[in-house]
Amino acid sequence: MKKCRFLVLLLLAFVGLAACSSQKSSTETGSSKLNVVATNSIIADITKNIAGDKINLHSIVPVGQDPHEYEPLPEDVKKTSQADLIFYNGINLETGGNAWFTKLVENAKKKENKDYYAVSEGVDVIYLEGQSEKGKEDPHAWLNLENGIIYAQNIAKRLSEKDPANKETYEKNLKAYVEKLSALDKEAKEKFNNIPGEKKMIVTSEGCFKYFSKAYNVPSAYIWEINTEEEGTPDQIKTLVEKLRKTKVPSLFVESSVDDRPMKTVSKDTNIPIYAKIFTDSVAEKGEEGDSYYSMMKYNLEKIAEGLSK
């Protein structure tokens, strides 16, 4: 059913494109700005920090929605077709699940490493462990700030290649942004070093904090491993509850983009409170705390450190 709906949306969008053939890529129209598409709000924000007002930027997956499985709207199809440059996460995020991004770029006749690029290129990939997804890549690399820096470097490189006239601006913005992220990363490592070992475990609904765990030496536990599998089954909850009863973990966390009911059940069964909602697959709405990649990571780091220090 999803596939049929997706194809209908594609057809409608391309009909609209045919009727508006004057709206093309910046190269074809002579526009001074690149048309750039990012698959989600995190990648879009990093891109914005590098490019500023030098590009026209469209983000596909709306704030607060799950990028693992998404159904592009006609506007997304149109923007993708017109794009000079497309940034996606890769490593099993948009190309896993219902493979919505693969279908989108194929229908837009875009080519990998010419029109669209994975911003995660160069990341030290961590793999999933559960039976249903074992051996597949864990996509949540951005939850390690060092990987966020790699994302920014890849974005700046591709922008400079496509738009050499603004290369100096992109490189200057990259330098300032990397310094900002590096300072936060250093602060986080110092903060987590001071938390007692028996309290040091981040417990979330989705098992998306493996990169975070490795970077900041904080073991992780979860109800389900990735959002493309079953979420919050009785067996999943039971397994986590049994694990937590053997620990001294003081706080639980729930992600802003998932149903919080399974974690509430875990909290009730273990008598461990949910300390805070944290961000994983999306930034917050504009004007709210966590509405950029930097501020969402700063918020996460502060809340997790506070919760584990209880």
Curated annotation (Swiss-Prot):
User: Can you supply a Gene Ontology BP term from the record?
Assistant: metal ion transport
Q: Where does a divalent metal cation bind?
A: H68, H140, E206, D281
- Is Cell membrane one of the keywords? yes
> Which membrane topology describes this protein?
Lipid-anchor
Citing just one GO molecular function, the answer is: metal ion binding
InterPro entries per the record?
AdhesinB (IPR006129), Bact_metal-bind_prot9 (IPR050492), Lipoprotein_PsaA-like (IPR006128), ZnuA-like (IPR006127)
**Signal peptide boundaries:** 1-19
Keywords attached to this Swiss-Prot or TrEMBL record, sorted alphabetically, are: Cell membrane, Lipoprotein, Manganese, Membrane, Metal-binding, Palmitate, Plasmid, Signal, Transport
The UniProt entry, under Pfam families, shows:
ZnuA (PF01297)
Where does the sequence pass through the membrane? none
Covalent lipid attachment of type S-diacylglycerol cysteine occurs at C20
Which sites carry lipid of kind N-palmitoyl cysteine?
C20
Query: What's in the GO CC field?
Result: plasma membrane
**Subcellular locations according to the entry:** Cell membrane
Q: Which family does it belong to?
A: Belongs to the bacterial solute-binding protein 9 family.
What is the purpose of this protein? Answer: Part of an ATP-binding cassette (ABC) transport system involved in metal import. Binds a metal with high affinity and specificity and delivers it to the membrane permease for translocation into the cytoplasm. Part of an ATP-driven transport system for manganese. Does not exhibit adhesion properties.
Q: What is this protein called?
A: Metal ABC transporter substrate-binding lipoprotein ScbA
Q: Which organism is it from?
A: Streptococcus cristatus
Which gene holds the coding sequence for this protein?
scbA
